[in-house]
C-alpha cells in the first residue's frame, strides 16, 4: 500500500525532547523527493544478477561516496540468484526510478540478505522496492533479512516485504532492515516480514541500533518470534525515536519468554506526532514499550493508539515519564491466555511507572475480555502516580487525575480512514468530547492539512476534530453503547 504524499507539517515549537532529537538526527533526515544523482555516478545498464553492467558489478567498482544510478533501466526487477550484494565502501547511494518501478528481490530461501553493507557510513536506498531476502545462520547471530548495514541507513520511497531472519539458537534482529547506527524511513511501507530464533530477538521488521526517524511510512504485519526474550514486534530502536504521519499496525511480538512492545520498543526519548499504532500484540506494552529509564521521556501528540493487546499495559507500558496531548487511546485489551498472564494493576490503556502529564486526550473503552469478572482501569500503574494536565475524557482511572476530568463514554466510531495518511476514531454527535478540549497550538487534528483543529466553539478532546455541520445526529448511539 502506498501512502499519500507527505503532508505539510504544522508550524509548532518543538517540545524539548523533540528538539534535542531533531538536532541529533538532522543530518540523516530523509528527503521527501528523490535526491539528484551526485557526481562519481556508476550507471547500471541491465537487470542481470552479475556481470558487466549489473548492479553487483557497479557496487564492486564503487568507492567511498559514490552513487549508483538505476533510473535508466528498462526492466522492472533484479533477481539475486548468487547471494547478497556485498558493499565494502562508505557513503554509498543507490538511486532507483521510484516506488513500484523497480524491485530487487531474492528467492526467499537463499539464506542471504539482499544488501550486506560492511563499509559503514551512510547507506542510502532511494526509489527501490525490496522483497524475499532471507538471512539464515545456524552457527551465529543473524541480522537484516533484506538490508544489513554496519553504519547508518536511509530508505526513501520504497515497498519492502517478505523479508525474513532465522538464527537457530543465536540472537536475531531486523527481520527486514538492520542498521547498527541510525535509520531514517520516509514514504516506506514494510510488511509481512519477521524473524525467528530460540535466542533473543529485536525488531520484527526494523532494528535501528542508534535511533530512528520514521515519516509518512507504514510498518505492518511483522512478527518477532523467540522462545527467549523479544523486544519490538514491528520496530526496535536502541536510541531515540521520532515518528510522524505513520502507521504501526498488526505486528506481533509472540516470544514465549518475555515479549515487550508489540508495535514499538524504544530505549531512548520517544516522540510521536500525527500517527496511529493499532492492533499490535505482545506480553508487555501492546502498542509501545520503553526501557525503564527516568532520564528519557515519551511525548505523544495528536495520535491514536487503538486495538492493541497485551497481558500488561496493552496500550502503553510507560517505563519513562510521559506527556500526551490531543490524542485518543481506546479499545486496547487484555486477553485471557495461559501464555499471557494478566496484570490488572497497570491498566488496559496506559500503565504508569513515572510522572504523567495528559492534556485534551481521550482514554476510554480499554478492557479485559475474559469471564472472571475482573476489570482494569483505563489508566493504572505499579504505584499511585498523580496525573497532571487538564481537559481530558476518561472512562476510568486507578490513578489520581485532574479535577476537571470528564468521566463518560466518548462514543467513538470504529478505527477507519477518515482522511489524512493515518486512521482515526471519529466521534459521534452528542459526544462529551466535542468542544471540551484545548487546541494545544496545533493548527490541524491528527489528519493534517485540511482538517482544522477547531471547527466548533473550541477544540474537541482527542486526536480527531469533528465537523459539527457534517455529523449525523442519528449516529449518536450508532456504536452500540446506548
Regions found by a protein language model. Give the residues of each.
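N-terminal secretory signal peptides that target proteins for export/translocation
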Residues: 1-13
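Bacterial N-terminal signal peptides
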Residues: 16-28
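Right-handed parallel beta-helix/beta-spiral solenoid domain characteristic of secreted/periplasmic
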Residues: 72-80, 91-139, 397, 407-413
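Right-handed parallel beta-helix
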Residues: 107, 119-258, 280
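Acidic Gly/Asp/Thr-rich repetitive segments characteristic of extracellular carbohydrate-active
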Residues: 46-69, 460
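Predominantly extracellular beta-rich ligand-binding scaffolds that present long acidic/polar faces
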Residues: 151-154, 179-190, 210-221, 227, ...
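Short, T/G/N/S-enriched strand-turn elements that build extracellular solenoid repeat scaffolds
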Residues: 56-61, 78-87, 94, 380
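C-terminal accessory segments
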Residues: 51-56, 398-465
